[in-house]
Amino acid sequence: KSAYKPLPMGDGQKMSLRLQGSSYFQTYSLSFSEPWFGGKKPISFSISLSHSKQFLYNYSTRDVTRNQSFNITSLSVGIAKRLTVPDDYFVLSQAVSFQYYDLNNYNTGLFTFGNGASRNLAYTIGLSRNSKAVNPIYPTQGSEFSISGKFTLPYSMFNGIDYENLGNLAEYKMRATADGFAPDGSNYPAGSYLNSEGYPVANPADAAADPAKVDQKKYNWLEYYKVKFKADWYTRIWDKLVLRSLGEFGYMGAYNNDRGLVPFERFYLGGDGLANFALDGREVIQLRGYPNNSLSSTDGGTVYNKFSAELRYPITLNQSASIYALTFLEAGAAFNEFKDYNPFKMQRSAGVGLRVFMPAFGLLGIDFAHGFDAVPGETVKSGWQTHFIIGQQF
């Protein structure tokens, strides 16, 4: 017994530090998770802090402008608890998050304003049920359901700001930032009020509203709510042949119609689902057979739905590597407003693919998908698209 010296083991806590950078962006993040918060029950606690900086980058000339940047600082604290009612498969999760968006002369068309700050303080609550079995890489039966809501405070209910009238106030009117010339050739000094046609006016009431100033005030503190639902079934058809059926829906709304929907946190549908660009907190939704983000407007959608049916068959399920082939049908759509929502108006696709899971690399895959419909704004159907899968499940 005195010679017995087991390897030291922890209690499952995990701490991660990430540093990433290039000539035009930098990211720093730190996270910690505790699976047995309190030490008695399987209550998961997590906290994360991150900061990223994106410099203005010209993809044609590859020039980086370092005095123009978009900085994001994020803090999130969450807790998740396994429930025993109605059964042991349910998990209730809650989180409070805060993001500080700081734009410094970052005029890329992403927002109407290139200078200013937006703050996003939100509470998220979710209920999920996961009974997938037996192999988490290749489930053969069971299901996973989740419903979640994300809510900010309804600031417009108590801050006393008349958002409908902002454009009529002098401080939110269009003003010249430098000496300039009117359309008729006459000149005007910096600071002059301008009307919608570009002419100087003496009375501020006759000047046009400045969208950048109005939106900066509207989105100083983000105000919205989001609701999402997802249902995922796995059914054994024959031997190891498995049918995966998936349906999901998301909606984003506003408390105050005069304040409107925020340009952050929107849904972008189409493509491989890899979030290569998420400065505005967007949610990227996969739909194979179409280019990335092509099924949403440039501003993103506020409501979407997606349905998928996928047949899978394993080639090998060894511990060192799991490989399976698949074929699928998918359909989905994203809409700018709920009044435009039509659950029967969707872009459709079909295809085949291959997945490889190795413990050292995670999940890798490739899909060949054919889009049967045209993307919004075009008349030619999408046709064949190739999608590479890295680390995420469809």
Label the model's feature ranges:
Residues 109-315, 327-328, 335-337, 378, ...:
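C-terminal outer-membrane beta-barrel translocator/porin domains of Gram-negative envelope proteins
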Residues 354-358, 362:
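Metal-dependent nuclease catalytic cores in nucleic-acid-processing enzymes
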Residues 312, 349-355:
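Short glycine-rich, acidic/polar surface loops and turns
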Residues 24, 71, 223-227, 345-348:
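Short, glycine/acidic-rich beta->alpha junctions
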Residues 1-144, 363-364, 369-394:
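Gram-negative/organellar outer-membrane beta-barrel architecture
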Residues 83-90, 235-243, 318-320, 362:
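Secondary-structure transition into beta-strands, especially the periplasmic turns and strand N-termini
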Residues 321-327, 338, 342:
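Generic long, charged, amphipathic alpha-helical segments
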